[in-house]
Regions:
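S-adenosylmethionine
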Residues: 1-189
Length: 189
């Protein structure tokens, strides 16, 4: 919201940071050098954030409009949430829900750094429809226009980077399926 992609590329170039446009993603750039992202010019001021291009697809597929109300379940650390808010031009309301209070804190920090006041974050059990309704009421949001759910998964698609996942067994996967089903059921009510 604060800086165009072209202006950010110019700023990074001036700081001798190698970066380029990511084709097919209107806001994305790939940074090839420069050290810690948090130390790059503009990061602390909220000029940009870091998100994998694949995660950005969620925002484009959801195609949120300014003024809409969105419920984002399992939202931490908040990358998809803030991208949705940016696509909405900061106009509307997003309730970002996560079970763990410390992870909700990450969402709040992320939204604050990016100056996205349309994001409200709540530590709520997303599998409980009654608790979700209470959370929606707390932020004066009725029925959301859209629901985003990035449900916990087995992570087996990341075996190359996370070899410890090889120890997953059928019981672990069944447990995840039940959790995913509970989240979907609660989101629909």
């Amino acid at each position: 919201l604060e800086v165009s992609r072209e202006d950010l590329l110019d700023s990074l170039d001036a700081a001798e940071v190698s970066a380029e446009v990511v084709e097919g993603f209107p806001e994305a750039i790939a940074i090839h050098s420069g050290g810690a992202v948090t130390a790059l010019p503009g990061f602390s001021e909220g000029a940009f954030t870091v998100q994998d291009p694949a995660a950005q697809l969620i925002g484009y597929l959801a195609a949120p409009k300014a003024g809409q109300h969105i419920l984002d379940l399992c939202a931490a650390p908040g990358g998809k949430t803030t991208h949705l808010a940016e696509l909405m031009g900061g106009q509307g309301k997003i309730l970002a829900v996560d079970l763990h209070p410390h992870r909700v804190g990450l969402i709040k920090q992320h939204a604050k750094r990016l100056n996205l006041s349309c994001i409200k974050a709540d530590a709520t059990d997303g599998t409980d429809p009654q608790l979700l309704r209470v959370a929606l009421e707390r932020v004066s949001m009725g029925q959301p226009d859209a629901i985003i759910l990035d449900a916990p998964c087995s992570g087996l698609g990341t075996l190359r980077r996370n070899p410890e996942l090889r120890s997953k067994n059928r019981a672990d996967v069944r447990e995840l399926v039940e959790l995913q089903r509970s989240l979907l059921d609660a989101a629909q009510t």
